[in-house]
């Protein structure tokens, strides 16, 4: 959008910009069905008035807001040129990224269009891609480092994106197999106390990983890949004593590892392998007196070459928008009441705020 002089000079401190939508894009793709995308922009910038006439869009009002509106439409056009449609969620996230850059909350090195058009994996008619700046940086870190920690609240996509990168690496023959693991902490990994076969015992704890796999691969191919050992889904206890070469390894729910388990897992790394460790340090379900390996490892490995820590926040939640506000509300409550994981500090570390 470019600034255009008009006969109606804006008041002092205000500005006006005008934008022409290229002929190859219909106004519906830019404004949304029933002007749904336009309403998102208007709600985000109450200090400006936006007018549409034919294929011309103009904005008048607060100079800062008008400048941001111009950038929003510019970013939208860049996304549309790739053939990717704009959604209300994408517009909201574009606005949030631009405002964060304007307020100095981010360095602005990546634009919304760069974030929203970075495709990781296309499967079953849908494309998996990052939706926030922190998610993009997390995905980029996985490409650039051997060991990456994705730490953040439920719903930030840390496990899902890691699994998409694992499938991408397998399909491009960067690795020969995928290994997915998580601690079965709810049973204390004492699975012998549970009824049923071994598969029946461990399946409830590993089911979220299976669900993600079904989103990314042909469901009919998964049993074949697992039977061949190309994909392995197993409890953390089954990693002991192994060296994992030519593999993309993901440890999920890492906040529920002990320091000893975390060290054991990290030292399974073999040649030509990559490790991604995900977890939420506010959801620790370990028994009394047991430290979280995910908390401790940050103090030990932060700054080590080829190891990266990506931290996501409520702003990166990609579930229902209410989830982000719920995460913030719990964090404020814990801070105000001096609690941790839903219990008084120093108390039992179970009963956290559960969900992923």
Across the structure, where does each feature detected by a protein language model lie?
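Short amphipathic alpha-helix segments
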Residues: 26-45
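Flexible glycine-/small-residue-rich
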Residues: 21-23, 52-54, 61, 182, ...
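N-terminal acidic, proline/glycine-rich, low-complexity intrinsically disordered segments
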Residues: 1-8
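A short linear hydrophobic-aromatic micro-motif
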Residues: 46-50, 309-310
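P-loop NTP-binding catalytic core
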Residues: 106-130, 135-136
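Conserved helicase motor core of SF1/SF2 NTP-dependent helicases
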Residues: 123-133, 141, 145-251, 255-356
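Short glycine-/aliphatic-rich beta-strand segments at the starts of folded cytosolic domains
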Residues: 9-29
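Interdomain "pre-motor" coupling segment immediately N-terminal to P-loop NTPase/helicase cores
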Residues: 50-115
